[in-house]
């Protein structure tokens, strides 16, 4: 008999406010432990230098993490002008120092270059892989490997301020955009060089900034629960967002209770849907009058709703540590 996973079955999404200096995986494991969750996964790593929103999916919520990985992001970034580093951030070594000599008009013109749809060559100090190995491992050995440019979209690039040699920007961008690369390229366009000294992710998809919670806050709630001699879940679980918020922008298809069992067994079913849905378009599936979220699917060529990823409804508790 297969061993049940350790931890409890708890489904949802935590909007973690990651602190600087820690890896995203370290933060993920801490969240998983605080919630005593049987399963957890994050939705796109933040560099150790970076802070801010890191959605952590728990339990069945991990099935929808890819959709948050693909979502738009927003960042607040501060760049130090006049210095270029080998990593394009303050964790690297300064490789060039130049005078800062540009006008406000030149800065605004340079910023406009990055708005809209462009091509970006990823930094060597990234987790993208070349022949099975992350680029940053090659970079640490002083090896430069070929990288293809990738299409990105900068929906907004707002000038926040320039104080001395520090430039602050607000950037709303598509998935796969490297803010460090934007700053490095901007520094070269201005002729002075630049690197990131502060990077904070302020938004993922449409998740509210105000719902973020730090590891310190989670730890304090666990300590409070122990003092009150109550289960930590009583204080922690209200922080969870429903897992269907990861696919909130998908059109909803509601399945009547009478045919729900067939769908949950993986069968394609015929349901009344909006005529505007396209074949193979991803949809959010709900059941019955209470519109309970059970997963995502697509409409096939025969007009049937085909389940693609369904949640598991657990009847038994998982093992505890």
From Swiss-Prot:
Record-annotated active site: 47
Listed InterPro entries: PsdUridine_synth_cat_dom_sf (IPR020103), PsdUridine_synth_N (IPR002501), PUA-like_sf (IPR015947), PUA_sf (IPR036974), tRNA_psdUridine_synth_TruB (IPR014780), tRNA_sdUridine_synth_fam1_C (IPR015240), TruB_C (IPR032819)
EC number(s) from the headed UniProt entry: 5.4.99.25
Keyword tRNA processing recorded: yes
UniProt keyword annotations, A-Z: Isomerase, tRNA processing
Enzyme class: isomerase
CDD domains: PseudoU_synth_EcTruB (cd02573), PUA_TruB_bacterial (cd21152)
Keyword Heme: no
Gene Ontology annotations of biological process type: mRNA pseudouridine synthesis; tRNA pseudouridine synthesis
Example GO molecular function: RNA binding
Reaction(s) the record says it catalyses: uridine(55) in tRNA = pseudouridine(55) in tRNA
Family the entry assigns: Belongs to the pseudouridine synthase TruB family. Type 1 subfamily.
Function: Responsible for synthesis of pseudouridine from uracil-55 in the psi GC loop of transfer RNAs.
Designated name of the protein: tRNA pseudouridine synthase B
Organism: Shewanella baltica (strain OS155 / ATCC BAA-1091)
